UniProtKB/Swiss-Prot annotation:
Pathway(s) of this molecule: Amino-acid biosynthesis; D-alanine biosynthesis; D-alanine from L-alanine: step 1/1
Cofactor: pyridoxal 5'-phosphate
Upper taxonomic lineage: Bacteria, Pseudomonadati, Thermodesulfobacteriota, Desulfovibrionia, Desulfovibrionales
Active site, UniProt feature: K36 (proton acceptor), Y266 (proton acceptor)
Disulfides per UniProt: none
Protein name per its UniProtKB record: Alanine racemase
GO biological process: D-alanine biosynthetic process
Enzyme class: isomerase
Binding site for substrate: R134, M314
Alphabetical UniProt keywords: Isomerase, Pyridoxal phosphate
Domain of life: Bacteria
Organism of provenance: Nitratidesulfovibrio vulgaris (strain ATCC 29579 / DSM 644 / CCUG 34227 / NCIMB 8303 / VKM B-1760 / Hildenborough) (Desulfovibrio vulgaris)
Amino acid sequence: MPISYNKASVVVSLQSIIANYRRIRTVAQRPMPVIKSDAYGHGLEAVGMALEAEGARECAVGTVGEGAKLRKAGFGADIVALLGALDREDAQLAASSGIIPTVLDIAGLERLAAQGTPERPVRVALKFDTGMARLGFTEHDVSALCERLRTLPSVRPVMAVSHLAVADDPTQSAFTMAQGAAFARIMAGLRSNFPDIMGSLSNSAATLAHPQLHWDVQRPGIALYGSNPLRGTALARHGEGLLPAMSVSVPVLQVHPLPAGRSISYGRTYTATKDATVAIIAAGYADNYSRALSGRGVAVAGGRRVPVLGRVCMQTTAIDVTDVPGIATGDRVWLLGGPGPATVSADELADLWGTISYEVLCLLGMNPRRHDDSVE
């Protein structure tokens, strides 16, 4: 549920997301933007509608319910629900909303078949496990699956999907290529029965750096939102030039001196070694600004980077503004993004947080949000 009780401000640049989509299209023939989990915190409906207007032929969401929400907002292109129809209610909703759910097992296939007819079959995407050991059929199930599908004219397989475990790590390329080979064998078996079925294997990293794994439809996710999935690797150049799409700011509650020798916040984990000035900002772990950033995080105040002092509290955090002249109550401080060269990226914040940019964006994006709609 979105956070509605604070004064944080999340601003999402749709123009940046579209620029990233255009960048991806220079290397991908048919990218299917992944906008699951509220578009990684960027706003499902706004992002989906902007991408459809830009020419996306389909988008991928997480759940059928998320897909129905997008459809209700007026999204007219195809929607693939990556978690599939989990129960009868989901199956009914997928059929009535024209959503393409993944199928993970025979029970799920039969659940969806009950909602279609030979004249109006429910379209499905067949999910295969090629190495994640997470969800879906295996390569050994292909023959029996095709045989069962031939007895169910009320469903129509239009796509087969699998997911890569380490496409972002070139030191494990052998595993990635083994997954690709397994998927190729799966597709050969499927196409001997369903010649028109499309294949979708590549995530952001593979979309950018492994064209041999593209198949018919590519599934960029984190790259759409400006994070380079290949950062820090020998393939990092393939993800350069992506634009961050989210900034998060909060107000200053109070500015006061912190004399040398005085501690601050819970646990007294920080004691000033010299006279300082601190600002208490309206952000804490209840606002999805992690307690893991205690004594580690940075923010942007007055165009300068400043450190977090002491422990992050539930709704407040202390920052050192000794070198930020004129800062006052009510001024905005950026936790993510920010004006000028001092901006904090999602990747950098994730490193300080001890996590990945996906989590940073999904969590901070739950705060009060607005969209910059200036898409060119």
